[in-house]
């Protein structure tokens, strides 16, 4: 809903027609990689920066010195070379179905290591790192918190408890309220959307030992066909005209633009916690693709292509 509303507002403000396609961030990266410098789209809007950083490393984004970047609350929320700019922050955590946990006589997990306890076997929903940027962020987060080898052992143990790896990062949040999974791993603002849609059986949990965050970003594709319109989009995306309509369309992320109206829900549900790690974006830029390969080697003894398609969804 937010993507559609943002495009409509851009058309109203500038008289430029916008065609858009909603894909997970991993799918966007795969698409622009295949298009190899002749992209079918001009800009990328939304989604975690881990796939953006992969695209930077592959030379697929066009740097731009955006004037409205002066309104970012910190330089943390932009690429040092202007390849992408952040518009919101999303906190990684757990969403749990309290009714199902009560029925099963289980306590809610409070930290990452709780997720691998045997009593949660088959109860966890998480996204597929071959398609979802959210899952790539989870992988990078565990590598940065635990070290590479321990992180891969962790994912091997976690896999025993995972019911399904969804195509999109928001997928698990949509499963937890109806009870399709009992514990969802993803961005907590997606959980807020579900709670406010009527699922009052969902509880949000920020991992006690620390967590990380996404920077939801926007960027210009290298070789795009409408460069001036693309630059205008970046300025627009970094403005209140764009970000203030997020909350009107069930998107409750913590905004990182100083002249924006912060959604009350983001503050109410604690989406600016004080225990986030000092996320290493440079490491993510250099190594995400390798870490994803290592993840599949750990949990499937092979590649993403060999993964069980009934659990690792790509559609």
Per-region residue spans from a language model:
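Mature extracytoplasmic/periplasmic domains
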Residues: 216, 221-278
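A ligand-binding cleft/hinge motif common to bilobed small-molecule-binding domains
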Residues: 50-54, 177, 182-201
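Short, well-structured alpha-helical segments in soluble
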Residues: 30-37
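Short, polar/charged alpha-helical segment
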Residues: 1-17, 94, 194
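Extracytoplasmic ligand-binding site segments that recognize negatively charged/polar headgroups
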Residues: 1-4, 26, 39-180
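Conserved C-terminal helix/tail region of periplasmic/extracytoplasmic solute-binding proteins
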Residues: 277-315
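Periplasmic-binding protein-like
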Residues: 90, 154-159, 165, 199-222
